[in-house]
A protein has these predicted regions:
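Conserved post-Walker A/P-loop segment of ABC ATPase nucleotide-binding domains
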Residues: 22-30
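Non-catalytic connector elements of ABC transporters
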Residues: 206, 213-277
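ATP-binding/catalytic-site motifs of ATP-hydrolyzing domains
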Residues: 28, 34, 180
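ABC ATPase nucleotide-binding domains
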Residues: 41-195
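ABC transporter nucleotide-binding domain catalytic core, centered on the Walker B motif
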Residues: 32-33, 72
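The feature captures the beta-strand-to-loop junction immediately N-terminal to the Walker
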Residues: 4-6
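Helix-to-loop junction immediately C-terminal to a conserved catalytic motif
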Residues: 19
């Protein structure tokens, strides 16, 4: 599950309330019938990966991962076994003796993930865990993180402001606005059938054409349709981003880069789209 929304919407506060770092002013937080508000944070059985990873710099990778097990009083033999298994799971089996300073950002992120998973938590909480990585590494880690989550099967709550990340990693998203959930559901459902104007405008780009909302990637250039003049076109690698002046206002168009010749700035074009859901 991904908690998604703009800065200040309450997603991180919600995660902190689940973790026990912030007390809600009213209500309850229930896990398997238990009210977590009556349980101390350390006893809630939650694994947490912080945005900064929060690794201990004076400990090796193995010692960092073992820390939670030590706090639980797990015997040394069992502790070593579970640490080794978890490091293999995240692809760091050969890095147990290294220190965090000797690891890349992506490797440190996996150490933090291993430390959270090794205690076998009821719920895994991820607080923008990929935000410190560069764009390419972030995409790679999204794939790895999803595979690991599928392998262990632990219920996971992810906080992110990155829409692509939320859609790539989650089975359900909670779109939040000013402390409220505007929509809860599968990512594709929230994107294709937004429940509120806020969700429609927040998830991706949206055009309002003749009273209807149309996603930019649903619009193509045709022989007839809504006539307009290309104001700007921007090449963004795998796609072209267009802004077209029409009688209905400025319309944004996104077309995949297929290698075909695309309209130039100043060209007259006709915009067409399918209104079917």
């Amino acid at each position: 599950i991904a908690l998604l929304g703009p800065s200040g919407c309450g997603k991180t506060t919600t995660l902190q309330m689940i973790a026990g770092f912030v007390d809600p002013t009213a209500g309850a937080i229930r896990l398997e019938g238990r009210n977590l508000l009556a349980i101390k944070p350390a006893k809630r059985g939650l694994g947490i990966v912080f945005q900064s990873y929060a690794l201990f710099p004076h400990m090796t990778v193995a010692e960092n991962v073992a820390f939670g097990l030590e706090m639980q009083g797990v015997a040394a033999v069992e502790r070593a076994k579970r640490v080794a298994e978890t490091l293999e799971l995240v692809g760091l089996g050969a890095f147990a003796a290294r220190f965090p300073r000797q690891m890349s950002g992506g490797q440190q992120q996996r150490v933090a993930l291993a430390r959270a998973l090794v205690i076998r938590p009821n719920i895994l909480l991820l607080d923008e865990p990929l935000s410190n990585l560069d764009a390419k590494l972030r995409e790679e880690m999204q794939i790895e993180l999803r595979q690991i989550q599928r392998t262990v099967g632990t219920t996971t709550i992810l906080v992110t402001h990155d829409q692509a990340e939320a859609m790539a990693l989650s089975d359900r998203i909670v779109v939040m606005n000013q402390g409220r959930a505007e929509q809860i559901g599968p990512p594709h459902e929230a994107y294709e059938r937004p429940a509120t104007p806020f969700v429609a405008n927040f998830l991706g780009k949206t055009n309002l054409v003749n009273g209807a909302t149309v996603r930019p990637e649903k619009i193509s250039f045709g022989a007839s349709g809504l006539t307009g003049k290309v104001r700007t076109r921007i090449f963004q690698g795998n796609h072209w981003l267009y802004q077209v002046d029409t009688d209905s206002g400025l319309v944004t168009v996104i077309r995949q880069n297929t290698g075909e010749t695309m309209p130039a700035e100043g060209a007259l074009v006709h915009l067409v789209w399918d209104m079917a859901p």
